[in-house]
Amino acid sequence: MNWIFIFLAAAVAIGCEARQERTYTVCQKPEGDLHYFKEGRKTDEELCAKRLATAYFHDEVNQTGWAFLEVDVISPKIPHYLQGYAAGFAEGRATRHLIDLHIINTVNGYCDGAKHFCDELGEFMVDNLKWMEQEIRENPEDEYWQQVNLTVNQLFGLIHGYENQLGAEIDFKQIAVHPIFMIQIAGDLEDLAMKFKKPENPKKVFSGPGHCSALVKLLPKNEDILFSHVTWSSYGTMLRINKKYSFKTGDPGQIYSFSSYPASITSTDDFVLTSAKLAILETTIGNYNEKSLDLITPNTVLTWIRAEIAHRTASSGLQWAEAFGRHNSGTYNNEWVVVDYKQFHRGKEVQPETGIIHVVEQMPGHIVHSDKTAHLFRETYWPGYNQPYYKQIIRFSDTDKMVEKFGDWYSYDKTPRALIFKRDHNTVTDMSSMIALMRSNNYTKDPLSKCDCNPPYSAENAIACRSDLNPLNGTYPFKSLGFRDHGAIDVKVTNSKLINSLQFTAVSGPPGGVTKDVPIFDWKTSPLREKVPHFGQPDRWNFAPVTYKWRKDAHRHYHLYQKLHKELSSL
């Protein structure tokens, strides 16, 4: 089999369309066949007997750095798998122009010089899809596998919507090499590339964000809990869509909003808010234990699917951890932090002893999690910076050996960002100061940004990194500290009020403009401009914070869910 991606020649032209808003609906005709139409076309609408899902798309990339998408499933009577397929198809039609551009900027060229790797990867993914299909068929009443079925059908629908092939036959061999599928498994790819020994391609690095910064901050007098995440990634990934999905599965988290990308039904960052009033984020942790890669098999559920299931089904941090831990794939190994805002009483002295914050870490064959509420109220913050916290994970991942080899940069409590968070977390008093900290980078002046390098500092050693500012001719003890296509590309923040409507404040693009050593990112002057595809992106990234108001409020849903749950429990 030849697992080669096809370049989409028309993508650039399609991406230049001037239309800013699109609404697409998937429905069923009276005879049961699927149909879709663009809102406003009455002739098409009259063919429908039952609406299934509608996607509302609003493109503000050039104005705010973000596009916005809401997908609403119409009825709880629609089977899970059809909810997923209809939602995915509507999104694929509404966002296809950005999908085209994102594919060019990220996936194209991934298999160049790596045919053997992509052959093995494709066979692995086909086996994985077949295994999940078998489990779904053998367990039709199992709620977990119903959720898996919803998720994979959402992916199939997304691909079919993008290709305008409503109801087309599913071919796993074609799906497994489709660029949209590759975008879906972007996080999992980092570990799969290690397992199948992908050769390094300096011209194309496509994987998950790899590194991020995160902070959960308890304000004085329990005034609020601020919840923030900064994605670090290739600058080629900066076409962004903030999304809100509203399913009708009856689950506590059936409605959720998240920061995301074209062609991705997951966050990938990850930053997610659910109608169960859970706020969820992750920061990736490295796995340096090559022997553990043997535990990665096709008979598991990849992280991108397990996370979606946990988001929808959990009403607490513990439930999230338990759902996420099933069928651990050992890929996209992260530290996940779940804050349950239902348990937090803003401004009250007396707070629950447990249940507010839960921390989960994964490695192949290992899921470690525990409640960290007491820690949060004692220390007033929980940071995330790509180093594992739990000793079992540190040992199993061989992170302790990396500390021995390279020093404190790989340690949990002495790595630069750990020290910066420890020093600066008390500067956070409100949303604005949280954004300021999470966008901070003063690498030429901050003593905590220093390294055994020439020049003696690195723009990587900051809460919001800008590795493009490191000199090309600099010398560094390891590549992560040097010049590369890698930096902070956003910030997202929510609090106990915003989460009621699944809102968050977000800034798109790299940090810049505060000091002369960290200029505003501009493709016209960037040394990466000829090396990194960035079709459809604004040239100059100098956007203000945005708090987008969704069309529908999720707060009412959760109270209705709680009422129904109590009624059913009393029967």
Swiss-Prot record:
<feature type="glycosylation site" description="N-linked (GlcNAc...) asparagine">
    <location>
        <position position="62"/>
    </location>
</feature>
<dbReference type="InterPro" id="IPR007000">
    <property type="entry name" value="PLipase_B-like"/>
</dbReference>
<dbReference type="GO" id="GO:0005576">
    <property type="term" value="C:extracellular region"/>
</dbReference>
<comment type="function">
    <text>Putative phospholipase.</text>
</comment>
<keyword id="KW-0732">Signal</keyword>
<dbReference type="GO" id="GO:0004620">
    <property type="term" value="F:phospholipase activity"/>
</dbReference>
<protein>
    <recommendedName>
        <fullName>Putative phospholipase B-like 1</fullName>
        <ecNumber>3.1.1.-</ecNumber>
    </recommendedName>
</protein>
<keyword id="KW-0378">Hydrolase</keyword>
<keyword id="KW-0458">Lysosome</keyword>
<feature type="signal peptide">
    <location>
        <begin position="1"/>
        <end position="18"/>
    </location>
</feature>
<feature type="glycosylation site" description="N-linked (GlcNAc...) asparagine">
    <location>
        <position position="442"/>
    </location>
</feature>
<keyword id="KW-0442">Lipid degradation</keyword>
<comment type="similarity">
    <text>Belongs to the phospholipase B-like family.</text>
</comment>
<dbReference type="GO" id="GO:0005764">
    <property type="term" value="C:lysosome"/>
</dbReference>
<feature type="glycosylation site" description="N-linked (GlcNAc...) asparagine">
    <location>
        <position position="149"/>
    </location>
</feature>
<dbReference type="Pfam" id="PF04916">
    <property type="entry name" value="Phospholip_B"/>
</dbReference>
<keyword id="KW-0325">Glycoprotein</keyword>
<feature type="glycosylation site" description="N-linked (GlcNAc...) asparagine">
    <location>
        <position position="473"/>
    </location>
</feature>
<keyword id="KW-0443">Lipid metabolism</keyword>
<dbReference type="GO" id="GO:0009395">
    <property type="term" value="P:phospholipid catabolic process"/>
</dbReference>
